[in-house]
Every structure is written in structure tokens, then in C-alpha cells.
């Protein structure tokens, strides 16, 4: 799966089971700062029930509060996520890819982050610190 695909699935969890249509540009402004065109989030389709999304959010929050994503705990925002270590090729001779997918502001999600660090080890040691920097930058701007 690609980081974009994983971000989309994670956003469905964050949005109560609704898979949103991805977009890269929120708005277009003229040189004077006037909004020329803006895009609003749209539901693509329902991937899971609200109850399923809530249970996944609960489990992903546990990963951050007391599991492999705990480096994101106590940072001034809530987060939910999942780490991963993906083997590839000949697992005996390659270093695994490090993954993290998650979202912040759990009660009213703001941002989804998907990180893959190829051939770098475990998700908790490599991908979570990268995600932490992204979340921190988002909330400190």
C-alpha cells in the first residue's frame, strides 16, 4: 500500500467511517490574497460503520497513549495511530521499512499523517519521530 492509500484509510477512521475524496490544494489565491477558488471536503464513500471507526480510534489511541507510538503522547494534542515494520524482498538480508499512520485532535480530527521510511527499521523508532515533527509543526504554526 502507498502512503497516500494508508492516509486515506486512516482518514476514514478519523471521519467516522467516511472515506473522503483526496485533494492536494485547499484553495487558490490571487497575488493580492483574494480567494479565486476553494475546495471543500467531500465524502467519497462509507468504508465502515461509525461504531467500527470508533473502536479503531480507541485502539489507535491506545497505541499512542501506552504503545509503540507513545512518543506522541503528552505533546499538547491528542493523537491516534498505528506503527508498522514492513519486511520486503529477502527479509533475511534487508532492513524493514518503518511505517506510521495516524491522526491528531482525536475528538475533532485536524490532520492525518502517513510516514514510510524505507529500509530504516521499526516504525516506533524511525517513523513516529518523523510524524511527531509534522504534528508539532502543524500545531506550532
Each model region followed by its residue ranges:
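Active-site beta-strand/loop architecture of penicillin-binding DD-peptidases
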Residues: 1-43, 51, 60-141
Amino acid at each position: 500500500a502507498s502512503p497516500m492509500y494508508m492516509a486515506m484509510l486512516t482518514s476514514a477512521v478519523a471521519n467516522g467511517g467516511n472515506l473522503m475524496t483526496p485533494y492536494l490544494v485547499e484553495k487558490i489565491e490571487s497575488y493580492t490574497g483574494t480567494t479565486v477558488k476553494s475546495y471543500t471536503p467531500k465524502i467519497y464513500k462509507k468504508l465502515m460503520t461509525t461504531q467500527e471507526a470508533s473502536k479503531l480510534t480507541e485502539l489507535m489511541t491506545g497505541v499512542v497513549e501506552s504503545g509503540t507510538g507513545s512518543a506522541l503522547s503528552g505533546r499538547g494534542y491528542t493523537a491516534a495511530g498505528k506503527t508498522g515494520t514492513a519486511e520486503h524482498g529477502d527479509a533475511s538480508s534487508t532492513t524493514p521499512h518503518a511505517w506510521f499512520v495516524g491522526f491528531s485532535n482525536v475528538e475533532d480530527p485536524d490532520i492525518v499523517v502517513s510516514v514510510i521510511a524505507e529500509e530504516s527499521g521499526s516504525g516506533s523508532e524511525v517513523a513516529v519521530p518523523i510524524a511527531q515533527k509534522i504534528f508539532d509543526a502543524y500545531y506550532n504554526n
